[in-house]
């Protein structure tokens, strides 16, 4: 097995006049039917899980769920106790939480906020002048500013709940956003690239190629950016100050879902219904544990306090709960 640790220079800090040529975006593998019982327990979820976050204040995982008719809902799964479903007024594409009881969901023209404490307090915020914009990604910076990404390749940094403070249009598409402090990392599947945007929101800091077909991105508590190179069958680990590829490790089985924790980086293998925990502390990822999962493990989150890993099926097979994962 070959392990590669690479440090790359930035592709440049100046914004490009137009996006470079794109490739066909990579996707998760279509998982086979599960042939072994998943680790832990499985809680039912009617529909397809699209994304998941963990909210520390309510000790709950929150799943963005879609139904056959195209509607969206947030389904909250406490570590203990029954789940709760909150229907959203229109389809949502991505979610982020503040860890303090509020979840933000990107939708066409703006975003929703959901108060997890009450469960039914849904508010909509329309971004000024962007009624027809298809927002596909969302994150929240350390200073509380909301940042949205669009299908047309723009990143919007809001200066208030609805006002656009800065707009950066240099991407082919925006598939995921992750905030490290007030710096935002952008994943573009079409360019298979990771780019950091400065705190003003108006300037690209650095941009790097991300493997052969990057699909997902997550942050860990150590300030690292994890990226799944699904087409290239690898886990990529980036530092952010400056943006630099620090680790590249082969992960077979169409790696896709990611979750960072204080001890391990979690990667799902969608071709085999498996999740693997890697220790990144030595500079070379070391496999520490693996679990069988629900079919189509397309999204994950982790509760560091209880050591619980939540694996969400993208095919309707439910939400898998693995207590003490990695211990």
Each model region followed by its residue ranges:
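Sec-dependent N-terminal signal peptides
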Residues: 1-3
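Predominantly soluble domains enriched in secretory-pathway, periplasmic, or organellar proteins
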Residues: 6, 11-327
